[in-house]
A protein has these predicted regions:
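Generic protein-terminus/edge-of-domain signal
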Residues: 1-60, 106, 117
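Basic, amphipathic alpha-helical hairpins
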Residues: 135-148
Length: 154
C-alpha cells in the first residue's frame, strides 16, 4: 500500500457517513490525482467522457457508465475532453452492514475492507439505475429522499 497516496479528507459524518460529490467541469482538461481511501467509491458519469483508472486499468466512462472502487484501491479520474459531469458516492462498508456478523459480512464486506476481495470496476445496468437515482436525489438536495434511499440501500 502506498500510504503517502492515502486521501486524508474526511468523507461524511458519524450521523451521515454517505458522501456525494458532484463534479461538473466545463472547458478545461483536469485530473484528480492518484489516491486511495478506506471508503467504497462509486463513480457515475452523467455526461461527457471521463477517464477512470482503477488499479492500473484504464477505462473511458461515457454517459450512464458507473464504476466501483474498492476500499484501499489506487485510482484517479480526469478528462482530456474538458467537459464532463459526474458524481462520486463514498461510504464506509459498515454503512451497508447490518453488524450481525452474518454471511454478508463474512463473505463480502470483511474481505472487501481487508483488501482480499475486489469488485469488478464496471457496474452492470441495474446498478447504473441506482446511481442515476442517487444523482437525482443529490441534485434535489431532498433530505427525506436521502433517508429513503439510505433505507433502500441497507
Amino acid at each position: 500500500m502506498y500510504f503517502e497516496l492515502k486521501e486524508n479528507k474526511p468523507h461524511g459524518t458519524k450521523d451521515d457517513p454517505f458522501s456525494t460529490y458532484h463534479i461538473k467541469n466545463e472547458g478545461r482538461s483536469f485530473q484528480i490525482p492518484v489516491h486511495w481511501h478506506d471508503e467504497l467509491e462509486i463513480i457515475y458519469v452523467k455526461s461527457g467522457f471521463l477517464t477512470v483508472s482503477i488499479s492500473g486499468e484504464n477505462y473511458i466512462g461515457t454517459p450512464g457508465d458507473a464504476f466501483v472502487v474498492s476500499p484501499g484501491t489506487l485510482h484517479f479520474m480526469g478528462s482530456q475532453a474538458g467537459e464532463v459531469d459526474y458524481f462520486t458516492f463514498l461510504f464506509p462498508l459498515e454503512y451497508i452492514s447490518f453488524c450481525t456478523d452474518d454471511m454478508l459480512d463474512d463473505k463480502l464486506l470483511t474481505p472487501l475492507k481487508n483488501g482480499h476481495l475486489m469488485i469488478r470496476p464496471r457496474i452492470k445496468d441495474a446498478a447504473k439505475e441506482l446511481c442515476e437515482q442517487l444523482a437525482e436525489i443529490y441534485m434535489a438536495k431532498n433530505d427525506e429522499k436521502k433517508l429513503e434511499i439510505a433505507v433502500q440501500i441497507k
